[in-house]
Amino acid sequence: MRMKDLYAPTLKETPSDVETVSHEYLLRGGFIRKVAAGIYTYLPLGRRVLLKIENIVREEMNRIGAQEILMPILQPAELWKQSGRWDDYGPEMMKLKDRHERDFTLGPTHEEIVTDLVKNELRSYKQLPLTLYQIANKYRDEIRPRFGLLRAREFIMKDAYSFHASWESLDETYEEFKKAYSRIMERLGVRYMIIEAETGAIGGNASHEFVVPAKIGETNVLFCEKCGYQASDEKAEYRGEYTQEQEKEKTLEKVPTPGVKTIEEVSKFLGVSPSKIVKSLLYKGREGYVMVLIRGDLELNEAKLKAHLKDQSLRMATPEEILKDFGVPVGFIGPIGVDVKKVADHSVRGLKNFVVGGMEEDTHYVNANHPRDFKVDEWYDLRTMVEGDPCPVCGEPLKATKGIELGHIFKLGTKYSEAMKAYFMDENGEMKPFIMGCYGWGVSRTMAAVVEHFHDENGMIWPLSIAPYTVVVDILNMNDAEQKQVGEKIYQVLSEKGEEVVLDDREVSPGFKFKDADLIGFPIRINVGRSLKEGVVELKKRYSKELVKVNIKNGFGTLLETLEKMKREYDPKEAAR
């Protein structure tokens, strides 16, 4: 490809709405263009990277025996209603009606479609196990699309689904996917973590995420340096002990707290520690209101709450709903005298004489105790784990980091097959529900994650495996006939050798070419410039300052050998060392 013909419009200035390095460089480098919030067009360079990522993923899927299909983006509501997720999935689901007023969704995922497919085709245990996958566009109506490709409304994903006659068979396939995803990460050349994760709206009873460490990552990871435990903060369990306070129960008293709503304000006003205050949070779900109680110095983990109550539709009640249904402003909600289901974090169990909202504006109760003053219906671990909390395996203090989720695998069990009546006949002639797994990989977000992982102040540093082109040949003076001739010859030789090469034959300054080459992130640059008078061209790795001089007076043999050596040694991780 000649640079003068390549549609790669680079930008000198950073667009105003950019929030991350990957968003900036992919826009400035001419890889993507924004259409609307969370919606992008992929330009030729971006498309080449995407195809390489897709091919790596496809090769690893095929390697473990998965078979590729392609399912429709437009999905009928009836299938989602069968599984119970039409209402549960949440506002991220893009819903629409056709001209006949029938409900559809633009698929955020395809469990329902694939389950409906196989239930009409697979009849016997002899046809199992089976794994199907696709690489296709997905849609989610993100409340705030951000970070470019990392949180988009339209994105490209590989989703796979496996069907089994036994849990042992599912376990085997699950482990095969773990290995396949690890190989994908290794081929991308990035550092990664495999962490225990919450299943969320997908459901199931086990889940792992494949995460690339990054400061702007939206997955909070807790890990133990001693035993190797790794989990998302949504999944990490608190197994430490809470103090059982021994003080005598005091008389319950309602006290005025004018304008005092937050934990910090209540703590200061009443002169008590936040750990002696119990937060009362009202949520709404399928079965109406539920009040959640947790110690004031801790944060509620919504993922744990939804998992324990088996209700993904749970959301925090709005101030307007609370005022209308309970007659009290937010900030003064409490568990005493309120007829709603109450669930509490274990941190509340051992407290004595604590503070709760007074269920009346500008009031709180002091010296509250349970079960004397109110009843807790269910107790769970509902706290969000943070750095320094004890490891649930060995008890050592946990460390924290952030990461970008690229892969997510789930043991679904029979959640979908039972709901959608998808059965097979086992070896005893009995009808059994399929045992299922599902396995997602974010293809388009992989592009952004790699840029977040490998870049410097000048631009992107692509690993060889997914670079749009491996080599750029820069003719530094297009008015120099010898430079043009040699540059063209090198370009021709490399092309004939099967190298993915770009010839920068634009009538621009050498500095302009160097800046574009660094911004775009070509792994290896060959300079054809002034040193050609001595029969020398220069080779340079993207992340290195070293120029390797190669004499070409006697042909291109040494040049080709040097290029091959550079490719073998090429490692973007060196940029961070």
From Swiss-Prot:
Database matches in HAMAP family: Pro_tRNA_synth_type1 (MF_01569)
Keyword Isomerase part of the UniProt annotation: no
Compartments (UniProt record): Cytoplasm
Record EC number: 6.1.1.15
A Pfam family: tRNA-synt_2b
Native organism: Thermotoga petrophila (strain ATCC BAA-488 / DSM 13995 / JCM 10881 / RKU-1)
GO cellular component terms, semicolon-separated: cytosol
Record key words, sorted: Aminoacyl-tRNA synthetase, ATP-binding, Cytoplasm, Ligase, Nucleotide-binding, Protein biosynthesis
Domain notes: Consists of three domains: the N-terminal catalytic domain, the editing domain and the C-terminal anticodon-binding domain.
Role according to the record: Catalyzes the attachment of proline to tRNA(Pro) in a two-step reaction: proline is first activated by ATP to form Pro-AMP and then transferred to the acceptor end of tRNA(Pro). As ProRS can inadvertently accommodate and process non-cognate amino acids such as alanine and cysteine, to avoid such errors it has two additional distinct editing activities against alanine. One activity is designated as 'pretransfer' editing and involves the tRNA(Pro)-independent hydrolysis of activated Ala-AMP.
Subunit composition and interactions: Homodimer.
Listed GO MF terms: aminoacyl-tRNA deacylase activity; ATP binding; proline-tRNA ligase activity
Keyword Cytoplasm: yes
Main location: cytoplasm
Protein name: Proline--tRNA ligase
Single Gene Ontology BP annotation: prolyl-tRNA aminoacylation
Similarity annotation: Belongs to the class-II aminoacyl-tRNA synthetase family. ProS type 1 subfamily.
Coiled-coil positions: none
Enzyme class: ligase
Lineage: Bacteria, Thermotogati, Thermotogota, Thermotogae, Thermotogales
